[in-house]
């Protein structure tokens, strides 16, 4: 999916407003995903999935860091996310549908924290961005 110049601007502006809350929002999105889509818990059998657990917060920070890296490399998402793609495809073997579920949960989380900035255009741009990230992360499944 091609991101337009307007999309890139919207993504960078929105992620800039996330700022120092990225790890918290990542953890919140994971918690939201686990509650809304309980089957996603199967990939984390060794985690304490209770609200506010250190493991969920830690993984939320990893998700946020990966997305921050992706925002910084919008013109080369495959290069920026290559190692993460290998990890999820070959070692973790995460079902690709789960990336869509996490993307949805992240959009809801961002909308709840940035209501004045989450315009339809920003929503569409972030959705395209997360779909592009998901496509990259599942590209090595073949």
Swiss-Prot record:
CDD domains: Hb-alpha-like
GO-annotated cellular components: blood microparticle; haptoglobin-hemoglobin complex; hemoglobin complex
Binding site for heme b: 88
Keyword Heme (UniProt): yes
Cysteine disulfide links: none
InterPro entries: Globin, Globin-like_sf, Globin/Proto, Hemoglobin_a-typ, Hemoglobin_oxygen_transport, Hemoglobin_pi
UniProt-annotated binding residues for O2: 59
Entry's Gene Ontology BP terms: hydrogen peroxide catabolic process
Pfam families: Globin
Tissues/organs with expression: Red blood cells.
GO molecular function: haptoglobin binding; heme binding; iron ion binding; organic acid binding; oxygen binding; oxygen carrier activity; peroxidase activity
Family: Belongs to the globin family.
Known function: Involved in oxygen transport from the lung to the various peripheral tissues.
Subunit description: Heterotetramer of two alpha chains and two beta chains.
The protein's name in its UniProt record: Hemoglobin subunit alpha-2
Organism name: Bubalus bubalis
Upper lineage: Eukaryota, Metazoa, Chordata, Craniata, Vertebrata
């Amino acid at each position: 999916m091609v991101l337009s110049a307007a999309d890139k601007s919207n993504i960078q502006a929105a992620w800039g407003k996330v700022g120092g809350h990225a790890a918290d929002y990542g953890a919140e999105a994971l918690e939201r995903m686990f509650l809304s889509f309980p089957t996603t818990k199967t990939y984390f059998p060794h985690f304490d999935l209770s609200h506010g657990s250190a493991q969920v917060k830690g993984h939320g920070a990893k998700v946020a860091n990966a997305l921050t890296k992706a925002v910084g490399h919008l013109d080369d998402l495959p290069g920026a996310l290559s190692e993460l793609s290998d990890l999820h495809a070959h070692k973790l073997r995460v079902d690709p549908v789960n990336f869509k579920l996490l993307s949805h949960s992240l959009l809801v989380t961002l909308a709840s924290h940035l209501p004045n900035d989450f315009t339809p255009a920003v929503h569409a741009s972030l959705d395209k961005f997360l779909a592009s990230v998901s496509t990259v992360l599942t590209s090595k499944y073949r």
